[in-house]
Swiss-Prot record:
GO MF entries: lyase activity; metal ion binding; phosphoric diester hydrolase activity; toxin activity
Record-annotated active site: H5, H41
GO cellular component, one term: extracellular region
Major location (coarse): secreted
EC numbers for this chain: 4.6.1.-
Keywords on record: Cytolysis, Dermonecrotic toxin, Disulfide bond, Hemolysis, Lipid degradation, Lipid metabolism, Lyase, Magnesium, Metal-binding, Secreted, Toxin
Catalytic activity: an N-(acyl)-sphingosylphosphocholine = an N-(acyl)-sphingosyl-1,3-cyclic phosphate + choline; an N-(acyl)-sphingosylphosphoethanolamine = an N-(acyl)-sphingosyl-1,3-cyclic phosphate + ethanolamine; a 1-acyl-sn-glycero-3-phosphocholine = a 1-acyl-sn-glycero-2,3-cyclic phosphate + choline; a 1-acyl-sn-glycero-3-phosphoethanolamine = a 1-acyl-sn-glycero-2,3-cyclic phosphate + ethanolamine
InterPro entries in the record: PLC-like_Pdiesterase_TIM-brl
Protein name stated in the entry: Dermonecrotic toxin LhSicTox-alphaIA2bii
Binding site for Mg(2+): E25, D27, D85
Length: 273
């Protein structure tokens, strides 16, 4: 999965997919009442990027739905996965469950079209703080209460705080999650980070008794870092330059080892070599 980083304006969806991304990451900010409000990152953000692009969250969802609904004039068949980077740092811990409920209602209405031929992309809810694990239960309970438990097949989870893997597993157990787990590791492109935790996550994924289904690394903008990440066995790389990742995947060392994921590749099933 080539994951376009910080896609917060509707026009950027096409821009990143046309550069080679089959997945995007979108920031979600919340208001004081735990309502998802804007797709907005803010300052500071990655070096070389504008931090200030934004849409109203519901408008973005409608644009995303158009881009991921077969038959729509704006349909992009390659776009199969969306990571919502939930900026829950602005919320009190006791608002996490409420944020999950509201997120579920927004997605159900504006993205899934109340279960009636909505967008088809898989969704990953990425949460920066392990203490906000109740967001997951708020989300899953709400979809069930609204009569659409089947949509949970399209939803996965990620804790993005670079916490110890054991602590992440404990948070998932508390949230009642036993699958659909992506594990992120990384740092802004302005700084360097080693791959030791990525390798730990990959080992957990491949152990057969681990908790992790997929591993992605962020933010990867350079060819050398891309090669290191692919060599470490990641499933996804998040990038500001999807074309760079696509170029590396076409190099002789990789073109027979890795390929771009398609809609038929489940993002929840660990890939067996």
């Amino acid at each position: 999965w080539i994951m376009g980083h910080m896609v917060n304006a509707i026009y950027q969806i096409d821009e990143f997919v046309n550069l080679g991304a089959n997945s995007i990451e979108t920031d979600v900010s919340f208001d004081d009442n735990a309502n998802p409000e804007y797709t907005y990152h803010g300052i500071p953000c990655d070096c070389g990027r504008s931090c200030l692009k934004w849409e109203n969250y519901n408008d973005f969802l409608k644009g995303l739905r158009s881009a991921t609904t077969p038959g729509n004039s704006k349909y992009q068949s390659k776009l199969i996965l969306v990571v919502f980077d939930l900026k829950t740092g602005s919320l009190y811990d006791n608002q996490a469950s409420e944020a999950g409920k509201k997120l579920a209602k927004n997605l159900l209405k504006h993205y899934w079209n109340n279960g009636n031929n909505g967008g088809r992309a898989y969704i990953v809810l990425s949460i920066p703080d392990l203490n906000h694990y109740p967001l997951i239960k708020g989300f899953t309970d709400t979809l069930k209460q609204e009569g659409h438990p089947e949509l949970l097949e399209k939803v996965g989870y990620d804790f993005s705080g670079n916490d110890a893997i054991g602590d992440v597993v404990k948070a998932y157990k508390k949230a009642g999650v036993s699958g659909h787990v992506w594990q992120s590791d990384g740092i802004t492109n302005c700084l360097l980070r080693g791959l030791s935790r990525v390798k730990d996550a990959v080992a957990n994924r491949d152990s057969g008794k681990g908790y992790i289904n997929k591993v992605y690394y962020w933010t990867v903008d350079k060819r050398a870092t891309t090669r290191d990440a692919l060599d470490a066995g990641v499933d996804g790389v998040m990038t500001n330059y999807p074309d760079v990742i696509a170029d590396v995947m076409n190099e002789a060392a990789y073109k027979n080892k890795v390929r771009l994921a398609t809609y038929e590749d489940s993002p929840w099933v660990t890939f067996k070599k």
